């Protein structure tokens, strides 16, 4: 029987042995030598080696005398693939012998495989930077310098790990690390808890106090959370949303943990109530400075669960870190603990206890003895971070302006919007549930009718029958082929649905689409296989009717899973849902949201024969004021394109906007060589898509595919010609893009007009695809980030005005560049006028926003009985017709339009889908 290494030896017969001093204190182990290392007969050569050796020297480690370099497998692999497990296993005896001879103080695995086979640990990015003692040997995993060059986001961790390594060799605390003697207090008794809170109550004015909560999942508004059946039976009280514990700290090195409603808390109910009263007294002290990490989460829970209002501005170390470094770096405390403190890995014990699956996020299920240690440590880490981060804001005027004018007011504005929430029509939600389940089933049945699918399922059934026959043979009497089939064909068990195609399986879809149907795509996975993702389906849409049905199925499934079935679990007893909005959610500065993800609410469709038109998701959101209220939406018009003008300041474009001309038509007229009045709907859509595509730095190929998905045929070459004509008409845009890309290559950062910085370390990546993506982000971020800050400032000003004016209207949703309000009908005109004025004239309300200059900013209004049935309107429309009159007029126009379309379908011999027939019969 041959060796697993024979194939490698065939091309490179000589093993590449380790190199370095036999008295080295460190062994650095990689999986195997790269081709270029093997050719030069030297480990850690090239850029990666230079980076490592320079870094070692910088921290005082001699890269020649102190280090021995080696690999587990001593041969390069074809195309630099990772070694196979068999190749590594066969090499391990030599590896251990090498370690015995050198006898180093520390062994450094630099990849996931070397980590696994040396230590039995996995996930090097998670365990790196920490010393582990295993069977008498010390291991210190680090990320390979080649990975750092490809993904510069790991550079900070790499530098930090080298500093820690040097300190370990010297027996000292690493430099630039916030290290303190750890002092902890776990208040497991009523007396200890009261004593600790009283100590904080006696702190002098101006003292800083960290707060942190651990909770049952993330939503404090609902009555019950979802849990696994077995867990629920064991811990029924853990289904109730509650604060299970609170942590506090008033100095670095210190942390305390107090149990509140944790299932293991033995205190009596009245004692917990007394603790809450003392906490309220502490947290509502206006002369203290409170600190938190992702504090909006804590404040939201305190308000909703304990009716404690922590309304003074708090220092949020996560937000400060985002101001200082909005980029690909991690801003969660456990990551920052590695970078800034000596407490990296403080959450390791918790990781092993975290509930999974349906119980994920339910910290009531974690034993208190483990949770309290994590909670106190979390507070300590946050206080240490605050001592480094708060001065970053206080001592920098630009960051201070961002903090005081956007971050903190935005933080509390979003909190108000979350607390108010948006009303849900439960009856319509139930209609959606029944209808979507029926439609998904219909589409699935339709896909199974295609002959290739029929044949595939027949083969699956036949394989199961063959397995049953093999099962009747005693295992000892089966041939190797039969035994192999018996194992493989287990997956075709009909009792588990194995005899039917799973249309959610990429593997089965790949077989069906590419092997059986013979479809072709230009989109591939990272492993080189043809992709079944949405972009690939769009590309293949014209090749097969099956793909069109599959796309419908995927869309219906997505909407059902994300907005129909899940949303019913997020509604509070008053039929309100409370999305959580995150300033830190995206690296460009745009808001993100969850529970539900408002940013993914589907756009309206305008074709009455489509399923989504008849069962509109957004229609479930209506006014909390019942028949006396309406939903009013204000949307910035072409905000990002207008902000682009702020960067290149071309009077012609400003005049075009001022005149009220249609920019998309004007650009289309020039690009397609037709008079502006002759520009078709498809040409305008193409113009709009391509202009926004330029902002997002989309390629001509990508734009062509996007347009094809819209039913518009424009080849890659035609899109390229359009782009060139656009830049010819707007040369300053082209120059600004070139200058921005050049600038980011010099300093690796870009800024928005509001001064927010985004770091783009991947611009220096040796992986060209990552460097190219960083270039694209360098162009997109200033525009999208500035636009997001304009919307956020509008939210701040509108929310402030509504509350100060005593009106009942409230902001209920914000999505990208739009602001949605829930208004009593008698407030609509007053609110509409003010909201529109604020959105279009930010510079009048905050002088900093005068950077918008002469560029006209426009907002457009929609109004309706619910979020889905909203109609475009002007203030003049409402003044002329009244709220009810205008909506009734638009509803009538909509019905007439739909009736004409249905009538035409019937006259042309077509048929109306079953799901639309009830609607047709009602309007006819």
Swiss-Prot record:
In this chain the 3'-5' exonuclease domain maps to: 235-386
PROSITE patterns in the cross-refs:
DNA_POLYMERASE_A
Record-linked Pfam families: DNA_pol_A, DNA_pol_A_exo1, UDG
Q: What does this protein do?
A: Replicates viral genomic DNA. This polymerase possesses two enzymatic activities: DNA synthesis (polymerase) and an exonucleolytic activity that degrades single-stranded DNA in the 3'-5' direction.
Name of the featured protein: DNA polymerase
Assigned keywords, A-Z? DNA replication, DNA-binding, DNA-directed DNA polymerase, Exonuclease, Hydrolase, Nuclease, Nucleotidyltransferase, Transferase, Viral DNA replication
Q: What family does this belong to?
A: Belongs to the DNA polymerase type-A family.
Give GO terms: molecular function aspect only.
Answer: 3'-5' exonuclease activity; DNA binding; DNA-directed DNA polymerase activity
PANTHER family in the cross-refs: DNA POLYMERASE I, DNA POLYMERASE NU
Native organism is Bacillus phage SP01
Give the Enzyme Commission number.
2.7.7.7, 3.1.11.-
Offer one example of a GO biological process linked to this entry: DNA-templated DNA replication
Q: Entry's InterPro entries?
A: 3'-5'_exonuclease_dom, DNA-dir_DNA_pol_A_CS, DNA-dir_DNA_pol_A_palm_dom, DNA/RNA_pol_sf, DNA_polymerase_A, RNaseH-like_sf, RNaseH_sf, Uracil-DNA_glycosylase-like
Kindly state which reaction or reactions the protein catalyses: DNA(n) + a 2'-deoxyribonucleoside 5'-triphosphate = DNA(n+1) + diphosphate
């Amino acid at each position: 029987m041959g060796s697993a290494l024979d194939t490698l030896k065939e091309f490179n017969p000589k093993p590449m042995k380790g190199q370095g001093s036999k008295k080295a204190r460190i062994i650095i182990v990689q999986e195997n030598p790269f081709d270029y290392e093997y050719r030069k007969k030297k480990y850690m050569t090239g850029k990666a080696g230079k980076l490592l050796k320079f870094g070692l020297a910088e921290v005082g480690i001699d890269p020649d005398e102190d280090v021995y370099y080696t690999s587990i497998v001593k041969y390069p692999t074809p195309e630099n693939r990772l070694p196979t497990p068999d190749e590594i296993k066969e090499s391990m005896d030599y590896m251990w012998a090498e370690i015995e001879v050198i006898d180093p103080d520390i062994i450094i695995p630099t990849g996931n495989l070397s980590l696994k086979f040396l230590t039995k640990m996995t996930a090097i990015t998670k365990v790196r930077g920490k010393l582990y003692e295993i069977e008498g040997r010390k291991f210190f995993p680090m990320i390979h310098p080649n990975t750092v060059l490809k993904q510069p986001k790991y550079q900070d961790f790499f530098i930090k790990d080298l500093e820690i390594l040097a300190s370990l060799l010297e027996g000292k605390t690493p430099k630039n690390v916030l290290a303190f003697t750890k002092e902890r207090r776990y208040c497991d008794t009523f007396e200890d808890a009261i004593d600790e809170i009283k100590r904080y109550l006696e702190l002098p004015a101006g003292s800083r106090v960290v707060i942190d909560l651990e909770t049952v999942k993330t939503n404090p508004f609902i009555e019950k959370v979802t849990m696994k059946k077995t867990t629920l039976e064991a811990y029924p009280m853990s289904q109730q949303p509650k604060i299970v514990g609170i942590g506090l700290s008033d100095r670095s090195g210190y942390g305390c943990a107090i149990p509140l409603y944790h299932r293991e808390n033995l205190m009596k109910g009245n004692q917990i109530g007394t603790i809450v009263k003392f906490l309220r007294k502490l947290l509502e002290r206006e002369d203290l400075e409170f600190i938190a990490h992702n504090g909006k989460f804590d404040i939201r829970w305190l308000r909703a669960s304990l009716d404690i209002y922590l309304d003074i501005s708090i220092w949020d170390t996560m937000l400060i870190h985002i101001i200082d470094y909005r980029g690909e770096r991690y801003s969660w405390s456990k990551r920052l603990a590695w970078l800034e403190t000596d407490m990296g890995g403080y959450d390791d014990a918790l990781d092993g206890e975290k509930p999974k699956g349906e119980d994920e996020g339910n910290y009531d299920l974690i034993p208190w003895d483990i949770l309290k240690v994590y909670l106190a440590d979390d507070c300590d880490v946050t206080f240490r971070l605050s001592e480094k981060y708060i001065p970053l804001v206080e001592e920098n005027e630009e960051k201070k302006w961002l903090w005081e004018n956007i971050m903190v007011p935005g933080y509390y504005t979003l909190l108000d919007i979350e607390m108010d929430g948006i009303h849900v029509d439960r009856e319509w939600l139930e209609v959606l549930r029944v209808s979507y389940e029926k439609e998904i089933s219909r589409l699935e049945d339709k896909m199974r009718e295609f002959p290739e699918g029929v044949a595939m399922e027949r083969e699956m059934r036949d394989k199961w029958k063959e397995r049953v026959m093999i099962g009747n043979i005693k295992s000892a009497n089966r041939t190797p082929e039969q035994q192999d089939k018996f194992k493989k064909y287990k997956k075709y068990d009909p009792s588990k649905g194995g005899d039917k195609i799973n249309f959610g399986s990429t593997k089965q879809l790949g077989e069906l689409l590419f092997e059986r149907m013979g479809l072709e795509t230009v989109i591939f996975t990272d492993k080189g296989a043809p992709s079944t993702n949405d972009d690939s389906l769009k590309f293949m849409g014209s090749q097969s009717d099956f793909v069109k049905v599959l796309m419908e199925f995927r869309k219906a499934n997505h909407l059902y899973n994300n907005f129909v079935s899940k949303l019913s679990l997020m509604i509070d007893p008053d039929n309100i849902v409370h999305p959580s909005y995150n300033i830190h959610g995206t690296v460009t500065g745009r808001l993100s949201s969850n529970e539900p993800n408002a940013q993914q609410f589907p756009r309206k469709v305008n074709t009455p024969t489509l399923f989504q038109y008849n069962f509109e998701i957004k229609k479930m959101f209506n006014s909390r004021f019942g028949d006396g209220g309406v939903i009013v939406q204000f949307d910035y018009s072409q905000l990002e394109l207008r902000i682009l003008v702020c960067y290149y300041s071309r009077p012609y474009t400003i005049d075009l906007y001022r005149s009220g001309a249609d920019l998309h038509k004007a650009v289309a007229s020039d690009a397609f060589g037709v008079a502006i009045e002759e520009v078709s709907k498809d040409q305008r859509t193409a113009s709009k898509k391509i202009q926004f595509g330029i902002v997002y730095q989309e390629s001509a190929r990508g734009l062509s595919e996007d347009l094809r998905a819209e039913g518009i045929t424009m080849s890659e070459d035609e899109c390229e010609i359009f782009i060139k004509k656009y830049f010819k008409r707007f040369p300053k845009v082209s120059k600004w893009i070139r200058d921005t890309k050049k600038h980011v290559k010099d300093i690796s950062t870009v800024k928005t007009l509001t001064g927010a910085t985004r770091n783009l370390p991947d611009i220096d990546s040796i992986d060209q695809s990552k460097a190219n993506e960083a270039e694209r982000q360098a162009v997109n971020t200033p525009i999208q980030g500035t636009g997001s800050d304009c919307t956020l400032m509008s939210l701040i000003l509108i929310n402030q005005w509504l509350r100060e004016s005593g009106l009942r209207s409230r902001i209920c949703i914000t999505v990208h560049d739009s602001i949605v309000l829930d208004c009593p009908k008698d407030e609509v005109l007053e609110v509409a006028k003010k909201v529109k004025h604020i959105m279009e004239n930010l510079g009048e309300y905050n002088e900093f926003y005068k950077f918008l200059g002469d560029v006209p900013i426009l907002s457009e209004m929609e109004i309706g009985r619910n979020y889905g049935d909203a109609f475009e309107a002007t203030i003049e429309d409402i003044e002329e017709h009244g709220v009810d009159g205008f909506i009734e007029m638009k509803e009538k126009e909509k019905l007439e339009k739909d009736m004409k379309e249905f009538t035409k379908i019937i006259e042309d011999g077509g048929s109306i889908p079953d799901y639309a027939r009830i609607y047709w019969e009602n309007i006819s």
